[in-house]
Amino acid sequence: EYTLPSDGMIIRQMEKKGKVNRRTWFALALMLLVVPLLLYLSVRFFHGRKYLICSLIVIVAAMLPFFMMFEGRKPKAREIMVISVLAAIGVAGRAAFFMVPSFKPVAAIVILTGVSFGGEAGFLVGCLIMMLSNMFMGQGPWTPWQMFSFGIIGFLAGILYQKGILKARKRDLCIYGFLSVVLIYGGIMNPAALFMSVYQ
């Protein structure tokens, strides 16, 4: 499943390049139907006050497709370790640059995780980075929305790479990073701010 080339990078050998399997479709349905519904119910009925419970439920929903990745094969320790380290680097990077406005090295790590390990891992790492880093930056009703936004960025990066649309080139990844942060993160967080202000 993994090879270690001379440059030391772990390269994921995609199962079937260009073909999205049933597990990925299940993950997509879970992430685009269940998680947004959960976020809406949290804002509508709890007025954003139960954000920690909602965040934990989003993490559990993100872990289900991730665990399904290992169905039928034995995961290697280095695979899980690298994913854990990527999440830790994202948390540390966000905390280190907290003084710099609108600059946090989160999207790059989430995108690289999605491209290298698949969309499910990208979604999980995006969720974990936002939830754990908000322990330092400040938790609030925005936390589940941030988790969902960066999770979708990582998941979509994995899908586009698997389909051959997104190439593992610096220019392509930078363009995707810019567009995904502006359109996906901004497109989710801006309406979320409106919902949170209306229902509080």
Set out the residue ranges of the language-model regions.
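Hydrophobic transmembrane alpha-helices
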Residues: E15-I111
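Membrane-helix interface segments
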Residues: K76-E79, G119-L124, L166-D172
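Lipid-exposed faces of alpha-helical membrane segments in multi-pass integral membrane proteins
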Residues: L30, V34, V60, V85, ...
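N-terminal amphipathic/basic-hydrophobic helices that include classical n-h-c signal peptides
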Residues: E1-Q13
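Generic transmembrane alpha-helix motif of multi-pass integral membrane proteins
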Residues: P65-M68, V106-G122, L156, L160
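Interfacial aromatic-anchored transmembrane helix boundaries in multi-pass membrane proteins
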Residues: A92-A107, C127-Y161
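Membrane-embedded alpha-helical hairpins and interfacial helices in multi-pass inner-membrane proteins
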Residues: E15-L56, T143-P144, K163-Q200
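Hydrophobic alpha-helical transmembrane segments
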Residues: I80-V85, A108, F123-C127, P144-F148, ...
